[in-house]
Design a protein with these regions (language model features):
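Active-site helix of classical SDR
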Residues: 121, 158, 166
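Short, small/polar-rich loop/turn modules that mediate ligand/substrate recognition or access, typified
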Residues: 174, 179, 237-239
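Substrate-binding pocket helix/loop in short-chain dehydrogenase/reductase
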Residues: 96-98, 102-108, 207
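Conserved glycine-rich cofactor-binding loop
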Residues: 15-16
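Residue(s) in the substrate-gating loop at a strand-loop-helix junction
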Residues: 142
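Short C-terminal tail/terminal secondary-structure segment
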Residues: 92-95, 147, 227, 238-251
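Conserved glycine-rich Rossmann-like NAD(P)H-binding loop of the short-chain dehydrogenase/reductase
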Residues: 29-43
Length: 251
């Protein structure tokens, strides 16, 4: 399929889970894809290249400004431009009472999940402005950006912050032809969630019971929403937080 033919997209957090599924979907739709992760996704990019797609891997710490700037530049140096970005990189911390949180844990989560989104948007937008072209950016929040859960204060704060960044920046760039939106995934089958199913089984069991559709989501189900938000089919969608959660947050 060629819905994204001649387009260039950055996908962060592309080593696995939703990020990898999104990178694979964009590649299959004809885009040239920069797979970005703190742990460089060399094999994941090579698998796409071996399948006949256009891809590169880039090691990047999204919480570090120079690393993010270099990542965007390498993408442009390789593919000649930038059209879209899915800022997906994020980390989780163990369930912890707010007063028991360590400062370094708070800082780590906020630096990756919120500051990282800001830095990625900053350099992606600078590149789109330099090109003078339209484009689209999708940021990964979470159902944790819409609700609260006891023991998840810093993670949920970081994901609420993503929505604030998304909505405000979307207003800044709507008139410039650059659309910015967010996805809010629910409980997705990813390595991070699979680990939580083991380490926090009681809490996850209770959460699963509250999902109306009665199952975990597949990473590909989120990827398809990201693809749609970047496509011309979503040309009038700006500053929105799209839940992909099996009905969890409408209860």
């Amino acid at each position: 399929m060629t819905a994204m033919k001649d387009k260039v997209v950055i996908v962060t957090g592309a080593k696995g889970g939703i990020g990898l599924a999104t990178a694979q979907l964009f590649a299959k739709e004809g885009a040239s894809v920069a797979l970005v992760d703190r742990n460089e996704p060399k094999q994941e990019a090579q698998d796409l290249i071996d399948a006949g797609y256009q891809a590169i891997s880039i090691q990047c710490d999204v919480s570090d400004e120079k690393s993010v700037e270099a990542m965007v530049q390498k993408t442009v140096d390789t593919f000649g431009k930038l059209d879209y970005a899915y800022n997906n990189a994020g980390i989780q911390n163990p369930m912890t009472d707010t007063v028991e949180l360590k400062e370094e844990v708070f800082d780590d989560v906020m630096n990756v999940n919120t500051k990282g989104i800001w830095l990625c948007m900053k350099y992606e937008l600078l590149q789109l402005r330099k090109q003078g072209t339209e484009g689209a950016i999708v940021n990964c929040s979470s159902i944790g950006g819409l609700i609260g859960v006891a023991g998840r204060s810093v993670y949920h704060a970081s994901k609420h912050g993503v929505l604030g960044l998304t909505k405000s920046t979307a207003l800044e760039y709507a008139s410039k032809g650059i659309r910015i939106n967010a996805v809010c995934p629910g409980i997705i089958v990813t390595p991070m969630v699979e680990n939580m199913l083991v380490t926090e089984s009681d809490a996850m069991d209770e959460l699963m019971k509250a999902v109306p559709i009665g199952r975990l989501a597949k990473a590909e189900e989120v990827a398809s929403v990201v693809l749609w938000l970047c496509s011309s089919s979503a040309s009038y969608v700006i500053g929105q937080a799209i839940s992909v959660d099996g009905g969890y947050t409408v209860q």
